[in-house]
Structures are given as C-alpha cells and as structure tokens.
C-alpha cells in the first residue's frame, strides 16, 4: 500500500466514526432589523463568546467554549461535521494560519500605518479608509487611491473639513461612489459629535457611524483596538466554507450566521487583528475562487474540502469501497442545510472549488442613454461642457456630459439631445451634431449603453456663462475632475474621432485602440507591487474582495 493510500485510508476510518446527534430546537426569527439593532445595543458591553453567532442547539462546539444565543435564530440544525471538534483543533488552526501570515503577508500601505501609528484614533481612521476602499475593489487598484487619500487627509479632522466635491474628485474612478460620501459623513460625526474619538468596539462602531456595517466594524475594532471579534468578507467566507465543507450558498441567512459564528470561534484573542487579516490574506492569495493553491495552504490538514477530494480520489481508484460519508453528515436530522445542495451534487472536476456553491446572480438590467461631448474654443485651449448629477441615486454628485434617455428613433434622439444641450449652453447648430459610437459600462446592477455624440462649436462666440450645475473645463481639468469611469470612456471615444488623434470607427465596450496599447494604471501597480509574490486570480465582494 502506497503512503498516500495508507494515509487516506486512516483518514477515511476516522471520518466514518459516528458523530454526536444534533438537536433540532427552534426559536422565532427576529421580527425586523430594528429589533436586531436593539438586541445588539443591549448586549454591546457583553464579552464576546467563543461561539458567538453559532446555533445554540449545536452540540459540536468545542468543549470549554461558551455558547451565546443567536441574534437571528434559525429553524435548522447543524451537524458537528461543519464545526471544529475541540479547542485543540481551533488552537491548531490559529497557530498554523498566523505562522503562515507572519512569513507571507503582503506589504501593504494600510498595514504599515496600522502597525506604526501610535494614536488610536488615527490608526482606526487609517484602517477605516482602507476597509471602505477595498469593498468590491481589487487591492492593486486601491493602493494608489489610498496613498493619495491619506496624503491629502491624514486625520479625521482633515477629512471632516473637506468639501464633498473634493472627496468625489479624489474618489473618481474607484467606483461605488457613495462609499466616499459616507466615509466623510462618518468623519464629520466623529469630529462634531464624538469629540474626535472613534468608537472603540465593533458594536458601537456599527451603531454610531454611517455606512459602517458588521464587517467593517469588526475589522476596525480588531485591527485598530485589539477587540477579539471575528469578521467575514468574501475571502473569509470562501476559506471557512472549504475548511468545514459548507457547500450551501454563503449569502443565505443560515450559512451567513454559521460563518460568522465560526469566525468568532476561531479569532485569536491575543492577535485578533492579525488573525482576521491572515484569514482574508489566505482567501485572496491561496484559497482563491478558481485554481486554489492547496499545496501552499497552511491549514490544508484541517480542510474538509481537501479531505473530500482525497476520499473521492481513493474511491475512483478503487482503493476504498462504499460511498462517501459526507452527504450523511447529519444522518439523524435529514438533509443537511450546509452541505452541497441536492440539485448541485459533487463535481469531480471542481475539487475543493465545489465549496461553496453560490446562487446564480440576477443579471443587471439594461438601460440606454445618449450623451454628447460639447466642445468650444477657450483661452487656454478647447473646453468641454459638464453638468452635475443629482445628489442622490446612481453616481450622485458626479459630473458628466449632458445626457438623455434613449429614444426609439434617431430623429427623436437628436432632438432630445439637442434640447438638453441648449438648456445648458443656449442655441446650438443642430447640423453639427455627430454620432461617434457607443460605450457599454456595467455598474453593480445596471448595464448602461451610452450612444456617444459630439458637437464642436467652431467660428462661434464662446459661451461664457452657464446655469448653476454646469461648467466648462479644459481637457486637463476634465481628467482630474469628479467624473465617473464611464464618462472617461465616453471622452476617449470622442477623442478618437477628432483630427490629429487616434482615429477609430464605431465601437462598444472599450474606447479607442490607442487607449489599449498601455496597461491600466491598476495593472501596472499590481505587476510592480507583487512581482515577487505568487500570482493569483482577481478577487471578487461580497464579494468583492476585494
């Protein structure tokens, strides 16, 4: 018998041993978010339990670790197969992960600030900024934005005194623009209402600061203040799902609560900030969504997903008889709500990527718009007209080219667009309006197609005054203004159609060919910053990740 077969045979024998029966007590779900917040407030001073967030009836929690009732109690039972069996296993997981992190962690600017900054409020602020920027955004993209932000506003007081226009301008291109606005709102509240001091616990951070949810509050509290509280983001959820063979949708209420319970159980009370960052780092660089590097994983020996792969390999080779015990992880309670769903059974080709199985995402709704780059000569060069979006809704407060919703015919479209232009700039020659191409830009929930038009005012008296909410900018000013990535794409299409520039025909998705010759700044930063590190797939939120 080969060493591998011998090892897996012993593993198979261990995993076939009977497991503790699981109780199935039920409690009522919290009636509303307000009720859950009130519960959190009443318990904000309570010491976090090692099993906080786990279903109380579950008998599989490690002996010696206290249990705490759920905020939202779910009518489901959990098999001990999806838990850590004892304190020794939890301790082994912590030690292996932290040892790996100490050796392999990436040198990131927000980590350096958190380690070097002695003032607790400034440290918490630095962590807060990084966590908000990293939501749904890749690390390589965030590095330059974070560095520029902290140089411009190194303290809460600096950010609180900034204008929203300045915040939008620096945030331009980072996406999810409400994040920057909420961050400034929070800074102002800390300065004006909290005496300039950040709340010190995850509970009070979430209660008092606008836009700070459970994850962000936990990250700030653990990294900046050393509170032993777990966190779950997209990376951590993936790690936990694989380590405990949780195949159900992580976004479901049941699975989400279970993951938060596991995170709270595992967090190292001596190094909570490092532990949480280590779990996120593992998901971002090793336990990736596709092609995970299992051979480099520090907790591979504790990973049930990896054990399942080895079992299946033995069964396929004929070295073991019978059927896997995984689907019978809760034989006394019926179908397990955390295992792979019956509709999506084990796929041999996926390996550990079987865990978790996410629900199919609803495709973004499709919308169309017509937008026009209106240009006129100016003393410092050509000027283009921008108008400001409303202060609420998509891209709130940002600047864009005059736009209208798409009309069913070209004639109606030109008429509507010309009327919009004249509303801001006065009478214009309709014959000069040219259709240049299209740009498709996908937001989180909208796939928006822009039909791009151009109108150059040549030989006319320049427009010197415009209504409030509009302004003329030079091309240089445009590139530093608070405009969205979609508008920058639109402008590149316009530039590609002008004499003396890189000409191009009607196109979609991306802009002019000349803009594709150089890699994006984020990619350049990624290549240079992580050249000495292992290459990984881009990390996805909520994902995501980041």
From Swiss-Prot:
Chain positions of site Transition state stabilizer: 233
Region Disordered, annotated ranges: 19-51
Needed cofactors: [4Fe-4S] cluster
Effect of residue 72 to E: Does not affect DNA glycosylase activity
Co-factor remark: Binds 1 [4Fe-4S] cluster. The cluster does not appear to play a role in catalysis, but is probably involved in the proper positioning of the enzyme along the DNA strand.
Cited Pfam families: HHH, HhH-GPD, NUDIX_4
Keyword Iron assigned: yes
Effect of residue 235 to S: In FAP2; loss of DNA glycosylase activity; loss of function in DNA repair
Effect of substituting residue 411 to R: In GASC; uncertain significance; does not affect function in DNA repair
Gene3D superfamilies to which the protein is assigned, alphabetical: Helix-hairpin-Helix base-excision DNA repair enzymes (C-terminal), Hypothetical protein, domain 2, Nucleoside Triphosphate Pyrophosphohydrolase
Impact noted for substituting residue 306 to C: In FAP2; uncertain significance; does not affect DNA glycosylase activity; slightly decreased function in DNA repair
Active site feature: 131
Residue ranges of every copy of the Nudix hydrolase domain listed in the record: 364-495
Consequence of substituting residue 283 to E: In FAP2; uncertain significance; does not affect function in DNA repair
UniProt effect for mutating residue 128 to R: In FAP2; loss of function in DNA repair
Mutation effect (residue 370 to V): Does not affect DNA glycosylase activity
Domain of life assignment: Eukaryota
Impact when changing residue 402 to S: In GASC; sporadic; decreased function in DNA repair
One GO term of the biological process aspect: negative regulation of necroptotic process
GO CC entries: mitochondrion; nucleoplasm; nucleus
Record's keyword terms, sorted: 4Fe-4S, Disease variant, DNA damage, DNA repair, Glycosidase, Hydrolase, Iron, Iron-sulfur, Metal-binding, Mitochondrion, Nucleus, Tumor suppressor
Compartment(s): Nucleus; Mitochondrion
Protein family according to the UniProt entry: Belongs to the Nth/MutY family.
Disorder named in the UniProt entry: Familial adenomatous polyposis 2: A condition characterized by the development of multiple colorectal adenomatous polyps, benign neoplasms derived from glandular epithelium. Some affected individuals may develop colorectal carcinoma. Gastric cancer: A malignant disease which starts in the stomach, can spread to the esophagus or the small intestine, and can extend through the stomach wall to nearby lymph nodes and organs. It also can metastasize to other parts of the body. The term gastric cancer or gastric carcinoma refers to adenocarcinoma of the stomach that accounts for most of all gastric malignant tumors. Two main histologic types are recognized, diffuse type and intestinal type carcinomas. Diffuse tumors are poorly differentiated infiltrating lesions, resulting in thickening of the stomach.
Protein name per UniProt: Adenine DNA glycosylase
Classification of source organism: Eukaryota, Metazoa, Chordata, Craniata, Vertebrata
């Amino acid at each position: 018998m080969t060493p591998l077969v011998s090892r897996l045979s012993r593993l198979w024998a261990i995993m076939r041993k009977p497991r503790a029966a699981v109780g199935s007590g039920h409690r009522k779900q919290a009636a509303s978010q307000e009720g859950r917040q009130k519960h959190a407030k009443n318990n904000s001073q309570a010491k976090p339990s090692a099993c906080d967030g786990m279903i109380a009836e579950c008998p599989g929690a490690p002996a010696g670790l206290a249990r705490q009732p759920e905020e939202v109690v779910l009518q489901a039972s959990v098999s001990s197969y999806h838990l850590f069996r004892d304190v020794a296993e939890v301790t082994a997981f912590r030690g292996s992960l932290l040892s790996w992190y100490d050796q392999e962690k990436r040198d990131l600017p927000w980590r350096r600030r958190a380690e070097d900054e002695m003032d607790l409020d400034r440290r918490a602020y630095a962590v807060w900024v990084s966590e908000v920027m990293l939501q749904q955004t890749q690390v390589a993209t965030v590095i330059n934005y974070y560095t520029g932000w902290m140089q411009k506003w190194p303290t809460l007081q600096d950010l609180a005194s900034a204008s929203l226009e300045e915040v939008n301008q620096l945030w331009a291109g980072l996406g999810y623009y409400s994040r920057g606005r909420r961050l400034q709102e929070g800074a102002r509240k800390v300065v004006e209402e909290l005496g300039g001091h950040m709340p010190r616990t995850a509970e009070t951070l979430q209660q008092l600061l606008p836009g700070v949810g459970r994850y962000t509050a936990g990250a700030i509290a653990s990294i900046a203040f050393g509170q032993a509280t777990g966190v779950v983001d997209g990376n951590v959820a993936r790690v936990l799902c694989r380590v405990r063979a949780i195949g159900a949708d992580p976004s479901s209420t049941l699975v989400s609560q279970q993951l938060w319970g596991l995170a709270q159980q595992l967090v190292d009370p001596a190094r909570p900030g490092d532990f949480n960052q280590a779990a996120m780092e593992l998901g971002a660089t090793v336990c990736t969504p596709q092609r995970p590097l299992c051979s480099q994983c520090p907790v591979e020996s504790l990973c049930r997903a990896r054990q399942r792969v080895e079992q299946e390999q033995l069964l396929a080779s004929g070295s073991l008889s019978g059927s896997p015990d995984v689907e019978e992880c809760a034989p006394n309670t019926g179908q397990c709500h955390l295992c792979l769903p019956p509709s999506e059974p084990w796929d041999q080709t996926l390996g550990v990527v079987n865990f978790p199985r996410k629900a199919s995402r609803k495709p973004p709704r499709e919308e169309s718009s017509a937008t026009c780059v209106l240009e006129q000569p100016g003393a410092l060069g050509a000027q283009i007209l921008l108008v400001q979006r409303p202060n609420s809704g998509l891209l709130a407060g940002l600047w864009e080219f005059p736009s209208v919703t798409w009309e069913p015919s070209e004639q109606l479209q030109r008429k509507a667009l010309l009327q919009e232009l004249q509303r801001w700039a006065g009478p214009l020659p309709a014959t000069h309006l040219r259709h240049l191409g299209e740009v498709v830009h996908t937001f989180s929930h909208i796939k928006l197609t822009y039909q791009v038009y151009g109108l150059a005012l040549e030989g006319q008296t320049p427009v010197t005054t415009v209504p409030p909410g509009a302004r003329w900018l030079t091309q240089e000013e445009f590139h530093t203004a608070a405009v969205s990535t979609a508008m920058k794409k639109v402008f590149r299409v316009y530039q590609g159609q002008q004499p003396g520039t890189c000409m191009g025909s009607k196109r979609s998705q991306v802009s002019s060919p000349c803009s594709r010759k150089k890699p994006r700044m984020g990619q350049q930063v990624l290549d240079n910053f992580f050249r000495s590190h292992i290459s990984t797939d881009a990390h996805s939120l909520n994902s995501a990740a980041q």
